[in-house]
Amino acid sequence: MPSVNVRDMDSFEAALKMFKKQCEREGILSEIKKREHYEKPSVKRKKKVLAARKKLAKKMKMLSR
């Protein structure tokens, strides 16, 4: 859980910017988007296999250059 310590001289905008950066670093928004809708285990497996194939194809393409 991100938390921001606001000093006396910090403005609200600066504190909000720091909070957004911490949320982005921890991957909170991507996690929320991922959990927005239920995904069946079979669909998760298919996506995982597809991502692995795509990664392998990209690696092979880079090696062939």
UniProtKB/Swiss-Prot annotation:
Keyword set, alphabetical order: Ribonucleoprotein, Ribosomal protein
Pfam families reported for this sequence: Ribosomal_S21
Gene Ontology terms: cellular component: ribonucleoprotein complex; ribosome
Signal peptide per UniProt: none
One Gene Ontology MF term: structural constituent of ribosome
Swiss-Prot/TrEMBL GO biological process terms: translation
Entry-linked InterPro entries: Ribosomal_bS21 (IPR001911), Ribosomal_bS21_sf (IPR038380)
Domain of life: Bacteria
Family the UniProt entry places it in: Belongs to the bacterial ribosomal protein bS21 family.
Official protein name in the record: Small ribosomal subunit protein bS21
Organism ancestry: Bacteria, Pseudomonadati, Nitrospirota, Thermodesulfovibrionia, Thermodesulfovibrionales
Gene this protein is translated from: rpsU
